[in-house]
Regions:
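Active-site-adjacent beta-strand/loop module that shapes the phosphate/pyrophosphate-binding cleft
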Residues: 26-33, 116-135, 148
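The catalytic Nudix box helix
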Residues: 61, 76-109, 127, 141-142, ...
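Acidic, metal-coordinating catalytic segment for phosphate/diphosphate chemistry
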Residues: 12-49, 55-56
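Conserved Nudix-box catalytic region and its N-terminal flanking loop in Nudix hydrolases
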Residues: 5, 39, 49-94
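A short, amphipathic edge element
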Residues: 2-14
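NUDIX/MutT-family hydrolases
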Residues: 44-47, 139-157
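Short loop segments at secondary-structure junctions
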Residues: 33, 54-56, 65, 130-134, ...
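Short, solvent-exposed loop/turn elements at beta->coil junctions and helix N-caps
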Residues: 12-15, 111-116
């Protein structure tokens, strides 16, 4: 299948905001019909997410307040890629250890999740972690969370 007719060519690009987590861009693109359109989007370095599977088939879930949603949310451990990260697997190992104090013998890549692709450039590398060992968590100083093992069947319902 030839997708070349679907591509858009960047005519101009301007950063509207630059921050520590993402940048906001406003680009002008040329469409396949030679008309132009504006594309506003967030450029993000990327992230990792880890599904920590316990020996008895549960998953360790963390809960933390998410300001944009204005509520406490249950999530799998995750974090953004840092500038020094050359391999997402290294970031996955780091985030698992920092957030819930866990190391794993095995990391299995599950794929790449692309959240709203029309407005966000972020790619989230997702891993399954098995063979867990437990230690002390060291979350970032602005991270306040708790975590607990949740049976997999409760996550599917």
């Amino acid at each position: 299948m030839d997708d070349s007719r679907l591509f858009e060519r960047t005519v101009s690009s301007a950063i509207q905001y630059s921050g520590p987590v993402f940048d906001v861009y406003s680009d002008t693109v040329e469409l396949c019909n030679k008309k132009t359109a504006r594309r506003d989007y967030l450029k993000h370095r990327g992230a990792v997410a880890v599904v920590p599977l316990t020996d008895n088939g549960g998953v360790i879930i963390e809960r933390q307040f998410r300001y944009p949603q204005q509520r406490v949310m249950a999530e799998i451990p995750a974090g953004k890629l840092e500038a020094f990260d050359t391999d997402p697997l290294d970031a996955a190992k780091r985030e698992l250890k920092e957030e819930i104090g866990v190391t794993a013998k095995e990391f299995i890549p599950l794929g790449i999740y692309i959240p709203p692709p029309a407005i966000l450039s972020e790619r989230i590398y997702v891993y399954l972690a098995r063979g867990l060992s437990y230690g002390n968590a060291h979350p970032d100083e602005d991270e306040f969370l708790d975590y607990r093992e949740t049976p997999l069947c409760q996550l599917i319902d």
